[in-house]
Amino acid sequence: MEALKRKIAEDGIVLSDQVLKVDSFLNHQIDPVLMQQIGREFARRFEKDEITKIVTIESSGIAPAVMAGLELGVPVIFARKRKSLTLTDDLLTASVYSFTKKTESQIAISGNHLSKDDRVLIIDDFLANGQAAEGLLSIVKQAGAAVCGIGIVIEKSFQPGRDELVKKGCRVESLARIQSLEDGKVTFVQEVRS
């Protein structure tokens, strides 16, 4: 997605050869116009999949997931990382390690919101090692629902997340794929267009 790549090139800050800071438009301050374009692009890529629900993880996955849900006309469920007094019944849970925060979280979704009849699109802001996506996959499978695909805003292609998800039979659609963050510079994967 060219608009996203431009925004990353202009406003993204390379903190190391492993970490890209995009808090000025994606995961702290949100650019609503860009987020709307992201939602439309996910909807375009998954429009034929008969998606019934979108599942994401709090908090940075919520904005792109909601915009995609708006475009597809389907509800969005976000997995919570913290216990809630209201999130108690029929919990579907998984353990997730955050590459950026270097912490492990127990994520949960109420089983009341997912059923075996659902066709789910998983959306997240970043794909690095694939831990968040794998946790969400586990939760969706616990509900007996079908995973139609995984939509990623920014993929760090130099990390193993995509390969791990593809090995599990997942379709992964990333809007911007980063080949490298070496020497303080963002280099994108050159996609072959068919």
Swiss-Prot record:
Its EC number is 2.4.2.22. Pfam families: Pribosyltran (PF00156). GO terms for biological process: purine ribonucleoside salvage; xanthine metabolic process; XMP salvage. It is found in: Cytoplasm. It is an enzyme of class 2 (transferase). Keywords: Cytoplasm, Glycosyltransferase, Purine salvage, Transferase. InterPro entries: PRibTrfase_dom, PRTase-like, Pur/Pyrimidine_PRTase, Xanthine_PRibTrfase. 5-phospho-alpha-D-ribose 1-diphosphate binds at residues 128-132. One of its GO terms (molecular function) is xanthine phosphoribosyltransferase activity. It comes from the Bacteria. It catalyses: XMP + diphosphate = xanthine + 5-phospho-alpha-D-ribose 1-diphosphate. The keyword Transferase applies. Xanthine binds at residues 20, 27, 156. Belongs to the purine/pyrimidine phosphoribosyltransferase family. Xpt subfamily. Homodimer. HAMAP family: XPRTase. Converts the preformed base xanthine, a product of nucleic acid breakdown, to xanthosine 5'-monophosphate (XMP), so it can be reused for RNA or DNA synthesis. This is Xanthine phosphoribosyltransferase.
